[in-house]
Amino acid sequence: MTKEMPVIYIISDALGETAEYVSRAAAAQFSGIRTKIRKVPYVQDEIHIDEILEEAAKEQAIIAYTLVVKKLRNYLEEKAKDYGLRTVDILGPLIKMLADQTGLLPSYTPNVTHILDEQYFRKVDAIEFAVKYDDGKDPRGVLLADVVLIGVSRTSKTPLSMYLAHKGIKAANIPLVPEVSPPQELFRVPSQKVIGLTLKPDLLNQIRTERLRTLGLGSSADYANYERIVEELEYARGIMRKVGCPIIDATGKAIEETASRILEILYKGERNV
């Protein structure tokens, strides 16, 4: 047995992070040894593979690779045999298994993960946007949003904004209160980008009463007063009519269901709900 420091060459047509994570996870299973990892990203041709394997052979390195182009994978395997190097194909077996399972052909597109990276950062931006422009904190967000949610308190504007943010949708929300005029920005955006949210007064009364109880406050406050709730809902509906936006009655609907309706409206341009 030897405790000689093993060397792993990471060869990838992208950044090589996948193979690096796997290699480090495997090496971590062996205490008392250190592992050298040499990562070579963006390998696109056979000449580059030749150069890498020539260097790897000097250290009798293990080759871990993520190459989606089959021709390059086959070439690497053959050349590695010539040098007596051991190889590990990180992606190939799983791609083949998925193809066998689904009956579909893989695209064999190198560096396709950048698409996922773009989706991830779009989601992060949308989440930060939702937090920044929640509950009418800054009315300028109305002009920047993909969608603006309006409604009285406790109609799920904030959770819906966050849910949509996780879909990459930038959502701002504005509370509608009879004593406070909505920001003028609300009337400057296209009405199809605004969604009105409402609930049946009985349900809203229950939700607000429970909210007060959770906060340790009495249920006699105007916030949970039935007549006050009806007044707020009528006021809000008037604002929604003035804006000319679709209105969703979220009574009895889960957040996911309401969000699905919002997305349908945005993508299909529906006017009446």
From Swiss-Prot:
Keywords: Kinase, Nucleotide-binding, Serine/threonine-protein kinase, Transferase. GO terms for molecular function: ADP binding; ATP binding; phosphotransferase activity, phosphate group as acceptor; protein serine/threonine kinase activity. ADP binds at residues 151-158. Its EC number is 2.7.11.32, 2.7.4.27. It catalyses: N(tele)-phospho-L-histidyl/L-threonyl-[pyruvate, phosphate dikinase] + ADP = N(tele)-phospho-L-histidyl/O-phospho-L-threonyl-[pyruvate, phosphate dikinase] + AMP + H(+); N(tele)-phospho-L-histidyl/O-phospho-L-threonyl-[pyruvate, phosphate dikinase] + phosphate + H(+) = N(tele)-phospho-L-histidyl/L-threonyl-[pyruvate, phosphate dikinase] + diphosphate. InterPro entries: Kinase-pyrophosphorylase, PPDK_reg. Belongs to the pyruvate, phosphate/water dikinase regulatory protein family. PDRP subfamily. Bifunctional serine/threonine kinase and phosphorylase involved in the regulation of the pyruvate, phosphate dikinase (PPDK) by catalyzing its phosphorylation/dephosphorylation. This is Putative pyruvate, phosphate dikinase regulatory protein. It comes from Desulfitobacterium hafniense (strain DSM 10664 / DCB-2).
